[in-house]
């Protein structure tokens, strides 16, 4: 089964393998998805820069892909990783560190 990229970018929810904690949300196009499969490291598509980026390429906070899950509509991906360092560019462990309720 493959993701359906016919409508463009797909959301990719990245979670930590051991804890299942949500680390970040990013977007993948087909090229980012294929590079992720090929390298076993996360690749995403930056909507603001309109280009691919490899998580941790400059910071060293890489994500080693352990598994990928596809939702029932084939239009969203869960990426299970072993995270090296913080996942968030702010230095926080997760991008979801602001509690609302």
From Swiss-Prot:
For the ligand (Zn(2+)), the binding residues are 72, 88, 95
> Which residues span the membrane?
none
Origin organism is Bacillus cereus (strain Q1)
Known EC number(s)? 3.5.4.19
Broad enzyme group: hydrolase
PANTHER family recorded for this chain?
A: HISTIDINE BIOSYNTHESIS BIFUNCTIONAL PROTEIN, HISTIDINE BIOSYNTHESIS BIFUNCTIONAL PROTEIN HISIE
Q: What does this protein do?
A: Catalyzes the hydrolysis of the adenine ring of phosphoribosyl-AMP.
According to the lineage, what is the superkingdom? Bacteria
**Mind telling me which SUPFAM superfamilies this protein's record contains?**
HisI-like
Quote the subunit structure annotation.
Homodimer.
Which cofactors must be present for this protein to function?
Mg(2+); Zn(2+)
Q: Which GO terms describe its molecular function?
A: magnesium ion binding; phosphoribosyl-AMP cyclohydrolase activity; zinc ion binding
Q: What is its main location?
A: cytoplasm
Q: Which UniProt keywords apply?
A: Amino-acid biosynthesis, Cytoplasm, Histidine biosynthesis, Hydrolase, Magnesium, Metal-binding, Zinc
- Name any one Pfam family assigned in the record: PRA-CH
Annotated residues for binding of Mg(2+): 71, 73, 75
This entry's comment on the bound cofactor is: Binds 1 Mg(2+) ion per subunit. Binds 1 zinc ion per subunit.
Q: What is this protein called?
A: Phosphoribosyl-AMP cyclohydrolase
Q: Give the UniProt family note.
A: Belongs to the PRA-CH family.
Its pathway, per UniProt, is:
Amino-acid biosynthesis; L-histidine biosynthesis; L-histidine from 5-phospho-alpha-D-ribose 1-diphosphate: step 3/9
- Catalysis performed (reactions): 1-(5-phospho-beta-D-ribosyl)-5'-AMP + H2O = 1-(5-phospho-beta-D-ribosyl)-5-[(5-phospho-beta-D-ribosylamino)methylideneamino]imidazole-4-carboxamide
Q: Name one GO cellular component term.
A: cytoplasm
Q: Which InterPro entries match?
A: PRA-CH (IPR026660), PRib_AMP_CycHydrolase_dom (IPR002496), PRib_AMP_CycHydrolase_sf (IPR038019)
Tell me one GO biological process term: L-histidine biosynthetic process
């Amino acid at each position: 089964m493959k993701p359906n990229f016919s409508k463009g970018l797909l959301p990719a929810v990245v979670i930590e393998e051991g804890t299942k904690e949500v680390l970040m949300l990013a977007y993948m196009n087909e090229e980012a998805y294929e590079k992720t499969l090929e390298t076993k490291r996360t690749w995403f598509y930056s909507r603001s820069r309109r280009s691919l980026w490899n998580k941790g390429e400059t910071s060293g906070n890489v994500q080693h892909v352990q598994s990928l899950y596809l939702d029932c509509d084939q239009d969203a991906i869960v990426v299970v990783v072993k995270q090296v360092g913080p996942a968030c560019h702010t230095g926080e462990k997760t991008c979801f560190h602001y509690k609302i309720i």
